[in-house]
Each structure stands twice: as structure tokens, then as C-alpha cells.
Amino acid sequence: MKKTQQKEIENVTNITGVRQIELWRRDDLQHPRLDEVAEEVPVALVYNGISHVVMMASPKDLEYFALGFSLSEGIIESPRDIFGMDVVPSCNGLEVQIELSSRRFMGLKERRRALAGRTGCGVCGVEQLNDIGKPVQPLPFTQTFDLNKLDDALRHLNDFQPVGQLTGCTHAAAWMLPSGELVGGHEDVGRHVALDKLLGRRSQEGESWQQGAVLVSSRASYEMVQKSAMCGVEILFAVSAATTLAVEVAERCNLTLVGFCKPGRATVYTHPQRLSN
């Protein structure tokens, strides 16, 4: 491949998280063609100079990811606990260098653990089995949601996946207003990372969690429920199914969990009192 062409591809990658590679189609194995593939890179979150976790993620909106992860894992209580943040290249991927308040950093050091993440990581940030499903502060019951508004949101969820439309390789997480309008959506090769990006962005912008719900394009794992509850989200809609542990955690923390969300269809696992038809 010519150097100029490679440089153009690298520039596209930097902007979109997409790279062009050569591949072969089943009906023509003799002639390669260029096609778009989603990028997946190791991203290290480094707090006050100490690497805390490495996750596989799309190289976009990493400041939102770092903020959302810090909130949903209980490392910080609010965006004010972070004094500064920089995304820098490292030898094998990217680092998000985070300047944490002294008080929160002391708490982090007490629970620090080494973790190598994966795209489908289901226990990210968990140190031992006893920590899985640890209850969070029970959520209040402050809102209701009309399920008739869900269908329109489902039709537009793909709008927040430009990389996914090119590659078929990303998950999306978006905030759904009571009207069914989707706002503030994010995508990533990792479903948990997409959710953290959404949580981080809305927290950074000071948006309320009391009027609306989270909609994700993936299944609902225990960690998706716990992350949502940690940030005050009362309702979580998932396009696919929920796991048993996700249902148990949602029940304990008063989160309304809904799966199998398709036009005209939804399965409510917990706390249906927030929903109406």
C-alpha cells in the first residue's frame, strides 16, 4: 500500500475510529478489496500517574469514557473530583491521564487492582467474587415512562452508530427523553464503554437523570445495570435480553429493567410501576 494512501487511512482512523483494510468476499476469493473495519485499541486509565485499568475501546470520546467509568465504578462522586484530563498515545495504545483529587485518590489506592479488560468484559473493576452484584443506593421512584414512545426511539438508535453503519461492529447507548427523542448517544466496540461514554457526557454537561431512560443496543448485563444505577438512572431499556444477575441487581436497587425491546414488543423484568401504555 502506498504511503500516501496509508496516511489518508490513518487520518480517517483518528477522526472516526474506522480503518480500511484489504479483505476477500466469499464469491470472489481471488481479488481483494478495501473495506471499513472498526478500530479497537487498548485504553489505559491512569489516575495521578498510576495505571488503574486497561479496557479495549474505540478511540473516540475517551474523555467521556474516563469520566463515566470513574463515576459508574464509584472512583469519584462528581466530575468536580477530576482536576484535569489528557489523552496521550502510548507504545501499545492510548492513555487517559486523569488528575484526581487527593481524597478520591486515597480511596482509589485502597481498592486498587490490576485489570486487563476485554471488549465483552462482564466484571470490569471487580476485585473478588464477593464484590459482584454488591448493592448500590436504592433508586427513588420519581418518574413514569410511556412505552408507546419506545418504538420511535428504537427506529432512530442506529443514527448514533455511524461507525456501526460502516462496519457492523459497534454498540450504542443513548439517552431517551419521555417524548421518545434520543439525545446524547455514543457508540463503541464495547457495550460497557458505550454506556460509560453516555454517562460521562451527561454528567459533564450537568444533565438530570430524572426525566428519561437509557437505551442500549446490546444485552443487559449485571454491570450495565450497576453502572446505570450508580449514576442515578432509574430505567434501562435493552434491545436484547437481560441476564439473571442483571435482574437480581436491578430488583435490589429499584431500577426498572426492560429487555427484548423491538417495535411493539418489550419484556419488563423489574419494577413495572414506572411504565405505562
Swiss-Prot record:
The gene is fdhD. Coiled coil: none annotated. This is Sulfur carrier protein FdhD. Gene3D superfamilies: 3.10.20.10, Cytidine Deaminase, domain 2. Pfam families: FdhD-NarQ. NCBIfam families: fdhD_narQ. Signal peptide: none annotated. Its main location: cytoplasm. One of its GO terms (cellular component) is cytoplasm. It comes from Escherichia coli O1:K1 / APEC. Required for formate dehydrogenase (FDH) activity. Acts as a sulfur carrier protein that transfers sulfur from IscS to the molybdenum cofactor prior to its insertion into FDH. InterPro entries: Cytidine_deaminase-like (IPR016193), FdhD (IPR003786). GO terms for biological process: Mo-molybdopterin cofactor biosynthetic process. Keywords: Cytoplasm, Molybdenum cofactor biosynthesis. Mo-bis(molybdopterin guanine dinucleotide) binds at F260, C261, K262, P263, G264, R265. Belongs to the FdhD family.
